[in-house]
Amino acid sequence: MEDILPLLNINTPYKQRISEINTIIKKPNSKYSLLNLTVVSSTLKYPKSVYSISPLGLQNSKRNGKDGIVLFGYERKKENSSSENNININSETNDESTVKDFLFNDFIFPIEGNEDNNGLYESPNFAIYYNLEDNNYYIKDFNTGVGALMKIKKYVMEGNTLINIGGNYLVVYIEKNRILIKIFNNSILENTQLKDSNCDIKQINLEENSNSYTSIGRSQHCDIIIEDMLLSKVQCCIEYNSKTKKIYLCDGDGKKESTNGTWVFILNPTKITDNFMFKAEHTLFVANLAMK
């Protein structure tokens, strides 16, 4: 688990982190939040619809790390060698039957149908973790799977941003005097790589002392038109504030929300707030917080 911590921007040594979490849990009258994760909809079959997360981690996790980190991914195949923190071997016998499945993830995504994972999903896809510094839960994608995306209303874009709207993916590059947008259709993306030859490229020019508003949707009145019936007439918009020098991605037209939502890949640690909605692996989740 030590190699996971830097990916989550956690600087506390692993054993010290566990000790500090246990102190919070065991302290009399200690107040901390619990996170309930609800499966709203999915093409996969889950054993239950609500999962509870505490500062220790996912309740009833087979990994049982109690480190405040919940790793999301697929179940790994059996391993013959032992490894600390992710395999349990009965020390009283060397019987191979005592070697349990190699479980590296806490939240296990069901495999569709009867297909075998063939070792393709050995690494966690993303994580939810408890931050000891501000006592909040955060989510971070590891960029190893399909990806975790959060539903946004108004989002500050800094650097490059990957957006999903309807059946399209938008890669947004923020440069000094312009915003470059590469639009990939999902049907093309499934069979090809993110190459310029496979996308439609749009550009927004930025003027230092002038605000700008760019609408994106299927309406012919939008500044950037994408022909996709899954999109609203105005699906989202990009706003530039010349005073703050900030660039915002807004769902809908900035006032009225879109029908299917605007989604951003969670490439940076993001705080989970009440009613936080995200999707991953054909599953839509909503997070709710409650005080202990």
How would you describe each model-predicted region?
Residues K154-L162, N268-M277:
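Short acidic-glycine-tyrosine-enriched beta hairpin
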Residues D274-K292:
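C-terminal interaction modules of eukaryotic adaptor/scaffold proteins
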